[in-house]
């Protein structure tokens, strides 16, 4: 079973946003509480984060599908749904995030560096958030949107200052074990090293990292052997050290021919453009500082071979060191030479001012609508396809089982200018309109949207209980009516009081009282006769 994986294909999906809630507030003595549906929670994001404790991508090799949690639905009483939890995926330092076609998305260097691999979908609005002066009690809510889904490629490129390159069994693993505390696998057969090994070297006051990669053979840049698979690990290195085998027993090999083959493979290898310097240029591997280490000089023929090829190498401009990983001969001088190159590279980076990118201002055009309409033809019939972030997002948020929600979508599209643009494109009632790409929503277009919410008994976005709310008297009107009633009562009392003072009430009462005894005695007045 593999214990080291430096390239995986990861399938990530953000969480889906929660749906908004449709609810009406219910409380004692408040018959018209209004909408109180809460918003849905946002879906969780999938984030890649550099973790110094992670050294391989093995976990994602066994479990390549990762999904963040979904957002919770909204609830009544203005309660919003729970946001989905963010899924943090730890990756080693030096991980490069790419698309399947090779486009670099991020280069994760530095502890804690993060990259959002898949964003979660936003939650839908509840009917409380959708209410307005014209739409006081919406009977619908918006749906949550699915999170982003993508397939990304993770490639691990080791962070090292110096890279050891050479043929298999040249002694690279023995050299890194002798110069650092690393303990790679060492054996007397080719391709013992199957994974990159890192070691930390201290030379004076300079501390740097060296990388041992699997051996290179002729044709490694074309994929032969293991070199092409692991050459990416030397792309970040500031310098290279050619480890040449002076004790080889193969008749067709010698240090000079090995160096020529390795240099040719390095020249053919195309360095990733994401490792461009501060000036925007990529330094090829064969143009970087290089040292030559003639290894195995402790063998009987190794010393003679090193002395034989050294003048030729020095004449080519190489700094040559005769070393032995077994007896540690020449390792101190080689270590200080590496430290000198590393220090110079670090000083050059520190002295170079950071490149400041001027902000690019792209003001929105005055006539920019945020969408476009493309006219197509299907089955000899015209088809109009509406494309744009807003229309596509609005369609995903619409509950097409709710006529009021469809009417709300029609209002938004009309306000955006889609209907006017369809008229300009020559659309006629009954033509097919598709919002989105191949998987878009298909409509039979009607300019007045008679197939939608206009057929409702009440206006779009209203509650029938609020239909007569505009006819109810206001508090001021009620006060005026009460004052009018008080004035009318006062006027009636004043009129009665005036009649009483005028004696009208006294004469009529005295007359009725005088007539009552005569009726009781059986006598009548002259008028009655």
Curated annotation (Swiss-Prot):
Q: Which domain of life is it from?
A: Bacteria
Q: What's the chief localization of this chain?
A: cytoplasm
What residues does the OBG-type G domain cover? 160-343
All residue ranges annotated as the Obg domain in the record = 2-159
The positions annotated for binding Mg(2+) are: 173, 193
Q: Required co-factor?
A: Mg(2+)
GO cellular component, alphabetical, reads: cytoplasm
Query: Which PROSITE patterns would you find in this protein's record?
Result: G_OBG (PS51710), GTP1_OBG (PS00905), OBG (PS51883), OCT (PS51881)
Key words of the record: Cytoplasm, GTP-binding, Hydrolase, Magnesium, Metal-binding, Nucleotide-binding
One GO molecular-function entry = magnesium ion binding
Q: Specify the OCT domain's residue ranges.
A: 363-447
Q: Does the keyword ATP-binding apply?
A: no
**Does the entry feature the keyword Hydrolase, yes or no?**
yes
Annotated region (Disordered), positions in chain: 466-529
Gene3D superfamilies from the UniProt entry: GTP-binding protein OBG, C-terminal domain, GTP1/OBG domain, P-loop containing nucleotide triphosphate hydrolases
Spell out the subcellular localization from the entry. Cytoplasm
Its EC top class is: hydrolase
Task: Give an example GO biological process.
Answer: ribosome biogenesis
- Family per similarity comment: Belongs to the TRAFAC class OBG-HflX-like GTPase superfamily. OBG GTPase family.
Record text on subunit structure and interactions: Monomer.
Designated name of the protein? GTPase Obg
Protein species of origin: Arthrobacter sp. (strain FB24)
The upper taxonomy is:
Bacteria, Bacillati, Actinomycetota, Actinomycetes, Micrococcales
């Amino acid at each position: 079973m593999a214990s080291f994986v430096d390239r995986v294909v990861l399938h990530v999906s953000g969480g889906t946003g929660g749906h908004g809630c449709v609810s009406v507030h219910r409380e004692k003595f408040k018959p018209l509480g209004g909408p109180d549906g809460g918003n849905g929670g946002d879906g969780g994001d999938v984030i890649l984060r550099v973790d110094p404790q992670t050294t391989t991508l093995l976990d994602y090799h066994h479990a390549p599908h990762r999904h963040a949690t979904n957002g919770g639905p909204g609830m009544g009483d203005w309660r919003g749904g729970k946001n989905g939890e963010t899924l943090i995926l730890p990756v080693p330092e030096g991980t490069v995030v790419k698309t399947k076609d090779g486009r670099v998305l991020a280069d994760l260097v530095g502890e804690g560096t993060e990259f959002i691999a898949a964003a979660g979908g936003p939650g839908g609005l509840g009917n409380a958030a959708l209410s307005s002066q014209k739409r006081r009690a919406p009977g619908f809510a918006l749906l949550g949107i699915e999170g982003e889904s993508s397939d990304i490629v993770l490639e691990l490129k080791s962070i090292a200052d110096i890279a050891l390159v050479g043929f298999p069994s040249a002694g690279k693993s023995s050299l890194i074990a002798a110069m650092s505390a690393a303990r790679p696998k060492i054996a007397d057969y080719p391709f013992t090293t199957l994974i990159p090994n890192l070691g930390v070297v201290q030379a004076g006051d300079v501390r740097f990292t060296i990388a041992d990669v699997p051996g290179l053979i002729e044709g490694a840049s074309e994929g032969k052997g293991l070199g092409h698979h692991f050459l990416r690990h030397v792309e970040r290195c500031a310098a290279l050290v050619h480890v040449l085998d002076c004790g080889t027993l193969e008749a067709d090999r010698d240090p000079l021919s090995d160096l020529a083959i390795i240099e040719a493979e390095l020249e053919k290898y195309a360095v990733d453009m994401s490792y461009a310097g501060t000036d925007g240029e990529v330094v090829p591997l064969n143009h970087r500082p290089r040292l030559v280490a003639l290894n195995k000089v402790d063998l009987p023929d190794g010393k003679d071979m090193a002395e034989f090829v050294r003048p030729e190498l020095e004449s080519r401009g190489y700094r040559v060191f005769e070393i032995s990983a077994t007896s540690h001969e020449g390792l101190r001088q080689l270590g200080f030479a590496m430290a000198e190159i590393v220090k110079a590279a670090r000083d050059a980076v520190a002295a170079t001012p950071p490149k400041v990118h001027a902000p690019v201002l792209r003001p929105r055009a005055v006539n920019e609508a945020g969408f476009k309409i493309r006219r197509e033809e299907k089955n000899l019939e015209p088809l109009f396809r509406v494309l744009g972030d807003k229309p596509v997002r609005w369609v995903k948020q619409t509950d097409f089982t709710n006529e009021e929600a469809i009417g709300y979508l029609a209002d938004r599209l009309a306000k955006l200018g889609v209907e006017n643009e369809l008229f300009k494109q020559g659309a006629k009632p009954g033509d097919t309109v598709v919002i989105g790409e191949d998987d878009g929503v298909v409509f039979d277009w009607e300019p007045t949207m008679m197939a939608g919410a206009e057929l409702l008994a009440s206006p779009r976005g209203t509650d029938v209980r609020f239909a007569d709310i505009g006819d109810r008297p206001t508090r001021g009107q009620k006060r005026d009516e009460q004052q009018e009633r008080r004035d009318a009562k006062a006027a009636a009392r004043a009129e009665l009081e005036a009649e009483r003072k005028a004696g009208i009430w006294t004469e009529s009462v005295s007359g009725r009282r005088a007539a009552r005894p005569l009726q009781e005695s059986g006598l009548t007045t002259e008028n009655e006769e």
